[in-house]
Structures are given as C-alpha cells and as structure tokens.
Amino acid sequence: MLQFVRNEGSGRVYEAEIDQGELGVVTGMQVKLRPDYQYVALGALYYDGVELPRPTRPWNGTFGGQTGNSPAFHGDMSKYSFGPATSEDTVLYWHKFIDQNKTLLICDRNLIRSISWDHLNGANFIFGKELELDGTLYKCRVLTGGSANRGGSNYAGGQLPNEWDRYVMNGADVGEPHFAYAPIPVPEDYPGTSFKDDQIAWARAHNQAWNWISMSSWCQETGASGSSRVIRGRDSARYWGVNSSSSSYENNGWRPVLELL
C-alpha cells in the first residue's frame, strides 16, 4: 500500500491510497479530499506540571450576564507547557488550517490574560518554541498581525499579508474568503469604531468561534516606536493596535499557535 498526497493549489489537497499487486501493478485507488480547515480538540495547558482548566468565558468584562474567567499570568512563563488533556474541562480547541505547505493550529481563544509580550518572548513563545504534543512536533508561537495599520486606520486591519487577516478575518473584507469552511466574519464584526463591550457582537457566530471581543491577542511585530508590539482583536474582529512590550493590561492575552514541523 502506497500513500500519495497531491497539492492542487488554492487549498485543494488530495490524499490517495494505492494498492499494488505482486509485480507493482496498480490494482485499486481511493482518493479523498483533505479539507483545508478543521476545528479540532488537542491537548491542555499546564503550569508547573499542573493541568489548567480551559477558560470557558474568555473575555474581559461581562457578557451574557457572565464575567470572564480567563486566568491571569501565573508569574513564570518558563513553567507553562502543553500536554495531554485528561478531561473535557481542560481540553483546548484549535482552528486547523492547511495552507500550501504549512499546517497551523490557532487556538480559538486567549488562554492567559494580563500578560506582556516580553513575558512571552522571554520563554520563546513569540517566534517559536519547539514542543511535542500527542506524539507530534510543533513550533509554538503567536500570529503575525501586520507591522502597521492598513490605510491609516486601526479599524481597517493590519498591512497585508499577515496571519490574523488571513486566518481570523479569513480575507472576508478584501474579497472571497480564503477558506470556505472556516468561520467568516460579517461586516458588522469589523466596523470603523470600537464595540468591545457590545453584547450583540459578542453573541454573533464569528466571535463565538474566535473569541476576539474585549481581549486582544499579542502578535509578533514591532510597532513604529520600537518599544511597542502589535495586538489584534478586542475592539473589533479586524482591529489593529500597539501596546508597550512590557504592558500586562488585563485585556492583553496569549493566543498560542502550533505550527507543524
């Protein structure tokens, strides 16, 4: 039995299993489409060897009558790790994208709040720390978000290309979505003003999928000042902004990305 993978471009990846006879003659072939997007459950976050509950209300403030329960930074970034989930209360959920030759798992929420970019970078979680999870090697990092805003407005998103606009926004504001089966925002999710406390926006499908309202996610890029770093989300699905790399505001969050190695 031979396995065969063919990338047709535009997100179309085919897998085939080919049966061979004794003399190497192909006797049968099954072909199936491998989707370029999946929503998957994988692993849990640990601190100092203790498995942490998944934040079930991953926002800052109160929505739907419930106050957010994202845990604050525990104090030592080097003590965070990923491992097997032993219960539904701890398992993490990821948006998995197969994009050309790259496979990314992007967490569907911030896992830790009140954390600075410097905290994350000090333990190599900004640009990539290698780890093994469920027998697979990944590089754990954060998304790129664009080195500046687009068109002079923070509400217009980040300069393209960047990963937040490609995967979270799914390119919906610049044309056809990049990934047909991934969540797609509606224009009401990215207005030209802040609505970080809006109950209606919180309840819409795109925020329920990505949990961006009221909590920003640190990204890789450095802002124009040199001491600032890019954040995305919080004020809208498309919002781009900067904070000091040392700031640990309660609405600064860590949204990990696992890149398959």
Where are these regions (language model features)?
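Viral virion structural and adsorption modules
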Residues: M1-V31
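C-terminal, surface-exposed recognition/capping segments
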Residues: F4, L111-R113, L133-L261
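Short, flexible beta-strand-to-coil junctions
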Residues: R6-G9, F97-N101, C107-S116, E259-L261
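GGW-centered surface loops in extracellular recognition modules
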Residues: G21-C107
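Short acidic-hydrophobic catalytic motif
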Residues: L92-Y93, I98-R109, N121, G128, ...
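Short, surface-exposed, charged loop/turn segments at secondary-structure junctions
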Residues: I115, N121-N124
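A short, surface-exposed interaction/processing loop segment used at functional sites
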Residues: H119, K129-T136
